[in-house]
């Protein structure tokens, strides 16, 4: 790749070919788009997100594990544990990885089942993975992570930091993910 084909650090998102680095021609918009330099076709695919629904129980009843975010977007908001699925990562593995990274709670990917799949208005595909219910007393103590203040329990459906998290939590508490 020639130095002139390297996109500048301040270039607009999606303004250069991801295969060869050449800038798209003036006026190129919409998807898919073809690079005039190398012929590669680029598609604007949704960014998949894995979200964990970890039910727990104690003497107060059933609850879901949630986190308080310390990063943007929705810093300070309460959300279900989740994040982007890595390249070539199985979505079930992503569910348990995100659960571990954001809460310290370990789970097996073989135990994850698809509870829901929803598309957000900004183009993200969210896959909600339901894990088996477990005793709250068996969970590790809440502690801060790189992205959260730690975990806590959501006992009823309430508005969460992300609208689709709210929809999924409501569906869980209404018994639609049994």
Residue ranges and their predicted role:
Residues 21:
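Detector for the canonical C2H2 zinc-finger "Cys2" submotif
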Residues 14-15, 130:
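Eukaryotic cytoplasmic intrinsically disordered
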Residues 85-175:
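Unchanged
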Residues 2-13, 24-29:
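Short, flexible, mixed-charge glycine/proline-rich loop motifs
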Residues 15, 30-79, 107:
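N-terminal strand-loop-strand
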């Amino acid at each position: 790749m020639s130095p002139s084909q390297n996109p500048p650090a301040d270039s607009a998102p999606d303004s250069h070919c991801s295969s060869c680095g050449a800038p798209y021609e003036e006026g190129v918009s919409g998807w898919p788009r073809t690079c005039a330099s190398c012929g590669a076709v680029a598609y604007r695919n949704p960014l998949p997100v894995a979200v964990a629904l970890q039910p727990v129980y104690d003497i107060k009843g059933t609850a879901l594990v949630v986190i308080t975010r310390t990063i943007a977007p929705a810093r300070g908001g309460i959300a279900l544990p989740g994040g982007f699925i890595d390249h070539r990562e199985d979505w079930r593995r992503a569910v348990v990885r995100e659960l571990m990274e954001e809460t310290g709670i370990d789970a097996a990917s073989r135990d994850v089942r698809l509870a829901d799949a929803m598309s957000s208005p900004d183009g993200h595909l969210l896959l909600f993975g339901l894990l088996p219910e477990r005793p709250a007393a068996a969970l590790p103590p809440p502690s801060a992570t790189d992205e959260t203040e730690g975990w806590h329990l959501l006992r009823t459906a309430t508005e969460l930091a992300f609208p689709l998290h709210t929809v999924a939590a409501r569906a869980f508490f209404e018994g639609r993910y049994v």
